[in-house]
């Protein structure tokens, strides 16, 4: 503390003479009382690693780590439970031709015709055309699992994996470049006494004061105004929120284009479920369960200071396998499957409706000539009358004149049935008959080749929890990475004495206290608590890349990707079983004429009559009996590609694709809640010297001090002017009132980062990750319950024709009856060649999503995976976003307890001349000098330069272990431009002032009296001890 006494108004006896030369240095004084606690020393060297602590409780979820390397594909899952009954199937295909119809009712009585002889059987007709493809057979048993498909395209990046285990210690990095100049070191121990300094300037004369009585203690000063610290930095990003609820079902999509006509054939009846297979091997780990329910929000922590970004933590232990998820929702309809093998022919359908009459066949060939009639008698030549019915053939008369053409005769009765004509052309296909009864299931077909990959299904909802696996406990995993800092524990016992801390910068001045009586020298105080954690060092160089972390948990399903390109066409399947009979072939060419009948007896030759006009075309004869069945025709050409079938059910999931490359670093998470306030930072550097305060009032006279020891005799001085000898100077008076506060000092460095705040509330759900690759196909599940019956199929082909009815009595000629039922089916043609694969059908409409399954319970924590191999160095991350606005200055902290008295250090180098001391006691009268006029008091001289650095002291005891430095990490630290302060004339360097927003000046706040006390109270602000460095 410095007091300033104004002597300008003093008057009285003559002044003492000028000050004599400085005496020799006195012996050291007794030890002083314990000083106030020093400021926190710099952090000591890191200690040896401690023994491993007990495993901590599981910390809150850390931020998402970087993407781990791709893991191996998982093993196939266990067979799923039997699925629920599927939706009603699509309309079935047309049924097979119906069975031969019953014989029709007897026809109307026909006109009696003379029975003709049966003609010779016609030549075998041409081979029929290939029939249409048969209906699909019943579903065969599931084939064996096909070979794994080719690796899928690289999937999107999975979500960040759990942090990997700590990597092996990297090799020592190269020496770094020289760092920036460090902050000022701690004050050295006192040096050895230096050489005597030059004599100080003459002191101004002291006033003659009679020793005053001891003053009474003053009243306690007012409390200081609160300080303004900066607000803490923003807290860390909260952990991702739980998975949101399923959204409402989307609106129905637009109606798709109508598909082409499906392939025929109804599906067979569902077979009975087979016996249960043997229990399969234990399945691989199931997909992760959904996030647990959201925990209650924690209390809001106080804001902490923002630390440097930490490095990625070591890998956590591998979690326990989750229980099996619930069945997913019904996936979207898959692409059309390949046509199944043709089923066995179904039972005959019921009799079809009578078809329309066929077109008349061509006229049959002329039959052989009949036997000649007997000769008639010759008639007289008639006049040319109307042409009568021909009489019996007479003997030939003379040729009469040509008669006129007779009118056409009435229609004669039907002739005898001619020989079977060549088959007529195919009639039109009759209306489809009703569906036949489903045939029995065909035998299991051979396994077809793997089809092309289906489209990716929509993500299913979260499955229900599976049963807990029965595996034995795994070995103990490696030690997990340290959790975040816990809440402050109870205060521990005082630690052992730390090394002496360096002298801290002065704190802000408190209000003046009462002046205490001088105490005896105190005993050496106990060792103070260890100083607070030092500031974070600059980020170290990037360490070697850590070992690869264990495989991350699969991310949530991604959004549905675009439709992939069709896979390559699979290998042709084996030839299907023989198809159903083909349609009737086209009419073959007429067969050659039959053999001639035996010749009749020769008649007598009649006269050749004139050619009559052609008669009208006769009615078609009744159908002849069926000819013998022709041989099977050759195999017809492949039929045209069938129409697009109904969309098949979802195929089994494809094999797991290789994991995609690591995704880019995600955007920064949202700001976390503010952490708790950090500890009080170290006191800032000395402020600039304040303006000179106004002169305080003179203190009361102090009590008389004890007489000093006599100094050695000086040389006799010349006699001085006679002065009234004054008494010994009194002790220093009380300090005058303080001057007004000086200008605000420069901003100190930021305080150490506070302990981590409690975890923030869970952040909002992150965006849905891209869909991961599908897992490998599990073994087939049990057969599903039979679906509802399909819609009725279209009518089958016409049945075979019924047997001929018995001949009825000859009736009047009826109107043409409807054509009889078609004849019996011919022998089946040879199977047609396999047709080319049809084009993929258009994608069906998306089915509605099934209801979400219930959330499964959380799985047991699995054993930790082994540490991965040492990974390559990661790429530098992008610079983070600029920090938030500068906070307000925090409140001034309480003063710390007094520190222990440090041991005495070695002597330092001689310091510069100190400020002027109080006037010494009068020396012996000097020799007479010339009486000079006292000059005016000169201005204070400039501050002297620092003395040379003293020799380094012995090293102190090792300090307590410092806090762990910030981990090396893969981000580039971009510092703000450093603002430079003017050079300090008393240090040979520059201070560097770092301020977040580039400002050099801090806001000054007005202090009004009412901020400190009532209007009628005096107040002052005391400036504490000043340390000139």
UniProtKB/Swiss-Prot annotation:
Residues 163-182, 310-322, 466-477, 498-507, 531-540, 621-630, 645-654 have a biased composition (Gly residues). The keyword Nucleus does not apply. GO terms for molecular function: extracellular matrix structural constituent. Keywords: Collagen, Extracellular matrix, Secreted. Residues 67-81, 870-884 have a biased composition (Basic and acidic residues). GO terms for cellular component: collagen trimer; extracellular region. Residues 1-990 are annotated as: Disordered. It is found in: Secreted, Extracellular space, Extracellular matrix. Residues 999-1029 form the Fibrillar collagen NC1 domain. Residues 13-33, 952-967 have a biased composition (Pro residues). Residues 34-57, 82-91, 120-129, 136-147, 199-223, 233-267, 299-309, 323-351, 429-465, 478-497, 571-580, 593-620, 655-665, 694-722, 731-743, 830-839, 855-869, 906-934 have a biased composition (Low complexity). Belongs to the fibrillar collagen family. This is Collagen, type I, alpha 1b. It comes from Epinephelus aeneus. The lineage of its organism: Eukaryota, Metazoa, Chordata, Craniata, Vertebrata.
